[in-house]
């Protein structure tokens, strides 16, 4: 089957597929319509010449290459293309003598398919060889990185740096060229990110090696920390280069990276649990320990971390972990409540505390088992990939030694481990069956090679058979590992809400548990937010979480009993919708407040650490101060990371922003201990320039990463909400300052004033970023003016705070300080107002009745008509046109069967309302009667009805599962598009058109009444609509004043042309198989799967483009000539 992961392959296959599509249509015309097929001798001769040239170049490459895999894989592709070309030539010759020949038509279609498939195989084989060249360079760098461990002198370091530089430059150049060639945007981003990380780490590596050499040669303290820094950097660079190697080998987008992320998350959770277990048990053992102190918080954090692990598990394992967490949480609440009432030493309280302590041990064991199982499966999966890679080299070499057979046996052993851990017996048996077949084939091949017959045709055929079987085994084991994990919910809030909504609307549809997983993810985030809240706020959020949990369980129970469409289920679904909205709003409010607090000052702790590290050797308590500040810095970094993760999970960020936050949080967690180590080296080597430079390098890297994290967090939350939260926090700080002055507490006053200054500076930073992001001159000017005014109020407030702290009883100084504080509040309010200018009331208020004047004067009479003239007739109302089905233009080719069917569906659908919540039976006659009456009276149909049609293909009963994936994808896009009227909005009109066309393609692919021509033409029509969506989206982006939104829109819409081109090629491949009996089921299924995957990607990309275009249209230039009208079909306020 064709693959299109590079622009070169796509550009070659597209014209080939276009020509093949013409041959396919000719074949069908001869087969169905009985038409004579014209003379094809000349075009087939041209194809033959092109194929001969391609094969000649390929054979020359094979003769000169040292790549054994290329030598093995090229000959079968040559044979496939040459055979297909021979069939075409034979078909042309037979048709020349008999234009109606049936065998000739069969040769024509089989040869066409073979040309397309064989050309794809040749191009893919060439491309894989090019990838192996890049991988060899990457592996060379990996090997040289290990040499860093033996560099112990400055001379060796200089030599090492000189040797590493050219190789790194070559790798960077090759990766840059490769990423530009890739068609998968995700792969490009992954390669660029990993390569950028390697580049950033290179100076850190040199610095770490330099400080290690310096401390070792001078025999100073800090060698252990320097060694940790160096090893960390080497391991980090190696991991990124290994990730580059993995991505280079991908030919389709896969979500396989989740396994390593989940393993890493489980390990981190387990480490966190272990570190807090003693503190938690200490609190439980002490009946006099206060509720809410560090010990109780440790228990909450343990349950939180264990809950994260539970969410990563499936089936019984998941239920046990989450059930234990919930039970222990309730028991901890009871213990805390008893202690708050002074009954901590009572037998009931002591017994409960002991039960919680024992329960924590049980929970820890469950978490360890879950982590061990996932790690075992992941390790086996990765081991299989490496061993199969080595085995393929052995299979390609007829004279290979016995080590290749050992690699295959090793891969089979790892696959057996995965089979044993499978919960699904069918999957387990399927893997075990494959193991037996591969083992037998490998033994037979090894015997032939031991007999010196490794180069015989039989041995070569066996080698190819084993290679294919190993690839199939890898696919099966990968699927088994993926199926052992729970359904993955979206990574961002809106995605989870959408998944949850789809399940709530259709609880009886099997969505593989995605909808419920999304709801569980939202509830889990709610619990995490509640853990850092106190008092009634915490109880309120937990109550909302429990309410959503209960309603979800009740709805799922009804659906399981087949009552998902009952009145009770519909009532539950409505309640669950409302509860989810409440939970979402409360979570976002809590998260915004936390971001406002935690991110008000990100760099002071690291600056204080730097001061402690550079303290003079004779400074008092030098070591103790350093340890305290290092602990504060680590704690602060942890808070930043945890809060950023909550912003990613609960904020309004898109997928790329969420992934960016997660990456920066991971980097911060890795860098923090390295910064502390670098600071400790500097502390123990005062005055050492190399130690100082190394610490500065590590510190700057940490600060740069946190600044990036802060920017992404600001993107993830609503700016206006953040400013509101910051303003409220400043008011509270000012109230604390009043209390401090009243109680004569200067330190409390200074703390409050410092907090006010930090929050004000944070607001300035947010405003500065928004000004840089915008190209709207009025907005920039307004925000800049408000920011300048705020900036001028901070220093006077700080000076007034210092003055009043020195003489806190002076009423005059107190008044000056409070006046300064209120000026800051006023300036903050102006910044906030600049982000949300006052809009006129909607609807406008009624006029003042007192201003109305009623008189008895009659209106002047109409002037009489000229004598003898008759009044002209009333002009007819404007003709109502169906935007989805524009009139055919002269010379335009339209897929007639599909369009006729679509028009019939459209006419039928006009009889029914598409407004939600109105049963068809209630509106059928009334709506039609009203519409007919309006038409008869000469009045236009009301605007509400102007584009209320839903093609029947997209109106499947919502209570029935959609088993056709292409149709499901079309419905998903259609649901998104029908939120808006398409009057005056060409993007919405094109999106609806695409949804209809894709629904038609679903019918054609399923073997409906359509033809090969219809399938090919449908794909072309979809591509045409895709081009229109892309063009319009780029126009919107060009006029958008928000740089961030513009970039998002362009990134989404740039995927569409590539995917639509691939759809045309795949449709041609599928068309060559329709009605053919000599195609294997496996080959036909593979073609269908690729077409389905492509269609889903296209629908998703258009859906995202519609959303981003709507967001971009809000920030359109005021002088833009290009506008789109965004009018909701169902207004948000109804």
From Swiss-Prot:
Phosphotyrosine sites (modified residues): 537, 822, 1133
Residues that bear Phosphoserine: 97, 260, 272, 275, 288, 290, 346, 434, 574, 579, 600, 721, 795, 809
InterPro entries named in the record: Alpha-catenin/vinculin-like_sf (IPR036723), Vinculin (IPR017997), Vinculin/catenin (IPR006077), Vinculin_CS (IPR000633)
Post-translational modification: Phosphorylated; on serines, threonines and tyrosines. Phosphorylation on Tyr-1133 in activated platelets affects head-tail interactions and cell spreading but has no effect on actin binding nor on localization to focal adhesion plaques. Acetylated; mainly by myristic acid but also by a small amount of palmitic acid.
Tissue expression per record: Metavinculin is muscle-specific.
Key word Membrane present: yes
Impact upon substituting residue 975 to W: In CMD1W; significantly alters metavinculin-mediated cross-linking of actin filaments
Any one cellular-component term (Gene Ontology): plasma membrane
GO terms for biological process, alphabetical: adherens junction assembly; apical junction assembly; axon extension; cell adhesion; cell-matrix adhesion; epithelial cell-cell adhesion; lamellipodium assembly; maintenance of blood-brain barrier
Region (C-terminal tail): 879-1134
Pfam families: Vinculin
Biased composition (Pro residues): 860-876
Region span, Interaction with ACTN4: 741-764
3 X 112 AA tandem repeats: annotated segments: 259-589
Region called N-terminal globular head, residue ranges: 1-835
GO MF term set: actin binding; alpha-catenin binding; beta-catenin binding; cadherin binding; dystroglycan binding; molecular adaptor activity; structural molecule activity; ubiquitin protein ligase binding
Comment, domains: Exists in at least two conformations. When in the closed, 'inactive' conformation, extensive interactions between the head and tail domains prevent detectable binding to most of its ligands. It takes on an 'active' conformation after cooperative and simultaneous binding of two different ligands. This activation involves displacement of the head-tail interactions and leads to a significant accumulation of ternary complexes. The active form then binds a number of proteins that have both signaling and structural roles that are essential for cell adhesion.
Function of the protein: Actin filament (F-actin)-binding protein involved in cell-matrix adhesion and cell-cell adhesion. Regulates cell-surface E-cadherin expression and potentiates mechanosensing by the E-cadherin complex. May also play important roles in cell morphology and locomotion.
Associated pathology: Cardiomyopathy, dilated, 1W: A disorder characterized by ventricular dilation and impaired systolic function, resulting in congestive heart failure and arrhythmia. Patients are at risk of premature death. Cardiomyopathy, familial hypertrophic, 15: A hereditary heart disorder characterized by ventricular hypertrophy, which is usually asymmetric and often involves the interventricular septum. The symptoms include dyspnea, syncope, collapse, palpitations, and chest pain. They can be readily provoked by exercise. The disorder has inter- and intrafamilial variability ranging from benign to malignant forms with high risk of cardiac failure and sudden cardiac death.
Similarity remark: Belongs to the vinculin/alpha-catenin family.
Protein name: Vinculin
Species in which this protein is naturally found: Homo sapiens
Recorded name of the encoding gene: VCL
